[in-house]
């Protein structure tokens, strides 16, 4: 979440100075700072298309003024995206059917692969052969979308390998999954959590908002058992697949919202989706939360504050502070890390480790 409402903080030092003051009621020790390379760090990019004089341009539009900016190069985007952008644009400009009513493009990369999604205001079934030719001629994993329709050429799934403390963790996911869009920072975040856990007394882990298992797979080795929850069915399916890719057998996934999990743990409601999981068999020493920008609601806070240790990954310092007001009644902040996920922008990712008072 942006800090621009508080000032024009762009460098990590500027963000650090602000955060030190902003969270001083909860934490006065040293913050751990994690930097990113300042170019080609972002693995996801979304652009509009602008049509003029029967040709096509990449564009961005200011959300407030609606002013148009023609885009020729994205210095923050992964090198694979930058290399592919001109090839795609040249191909589209030469195919009238492909460029007609084309309004957007999404790029997604991993260390190994690249996928492309084209967005249309027309029935993509009518240009299926053109799309297939594009995929074949440019050797690209292609997804095309229009209202109520989706076509896939080659595959929509991407493979990723993260290096965590000398270990390789293998993942598969697609464009519909929530991903950390800066791979270097993602590896540093996971490693930071692993380093804290390595010196802790540990039993079982409860993880909320687990997605496709980004943290889960790397942290599982530190615990006897892991219960990880997520509401997205496709993300759960990828998480199960990623367990097999890593030969990990101590993780139990449940497709539940955090509110549903709270009801289940308090035995206020039974869920068929938990029929193969006995909650009483878990002894949670740690809970990990990586919530959306809105942060944690009261039911989740009431749930997690029962546990000895909390790891909170936050993309929004504002809601993090609000949540810490509640959590600080039972826990204290032991470690605080700042991750410069989006370099030279007011955005900041935080990691907080809390233990029971």
Curated annotation (Swiss-Prot):
Q: What class of enzyme is it?
A: transferase
Q: Name one GO molecular function term.
A: tRNA binding
Query: Quick one: a GO cellular component term?
Result: cytosol
Any S-S bridges, and between which cysteines? none
Q: Which Pfam families match?
A: tRNA_U5-meth_tr
Alphabetical keyword list = Methyltransferase, S-adenosyl-L-methionine, Transferase, tRNA processing
Which reaction equations make up its catalytic activity?
Answer: uridine(54) in tRNA + S-adenosyl-L-methionine = 5-methyluridine(54) in tRNA + S-adenosyl-L-homocysteine + H(+); uridine(341) in tmRNA + S-adenosyl-L-methionine = 5-methyluridine(341) in tmRNA + S-adenosyl-L-homocysteine + H(+)
Read off the SUPFAM superfamilies from this record.
S-adenosyl-L-methionine-dependent methyltransferases
**Name recorded for this polypeptide:** tRNA/tmRNA (uracil-C(5))-methyltransferase
Q: Which residues bind S-adenosyl-L-methionine?
A: 180, 209, 214, 230, 290
- Reported function: Dual-specificity methyltransferase that catalyzes the formation of 5-methyluridine at position 54 (m5U54) in all tRNAs, and that of position 341 (m5U341) in tmRNA (transfer-mRNA).
**Methyltransferase found in the keyword field:** yes
Which family does the similarity line name?
Belongs to the class I-like SAM-binding methyltransferase superfamily. RNA M5U methyltransferase family. TrmA subfamily.
Q: Which domain of life is it from?
A: Bacteria
Which biological processes are named by the entry's GO terms?
methylation; tRNA processing
| Assigned EC number | 2.1.1.-, 2.1.1.35
Upper classification of the source organism reads:
Bacteria, Pseudomonadati, Campylobacterota, Epsilonproteobacteria, Campylobacterales
InterPro entries, alphabetized: MeTrfase_TrmA_AS, SAM-dependent_MTases_sf, TrmA_MeTrfase, U5_MeTrfase_fam
What is annotated as the active site? 315 (nucleophile), 349 (proton acceptor)
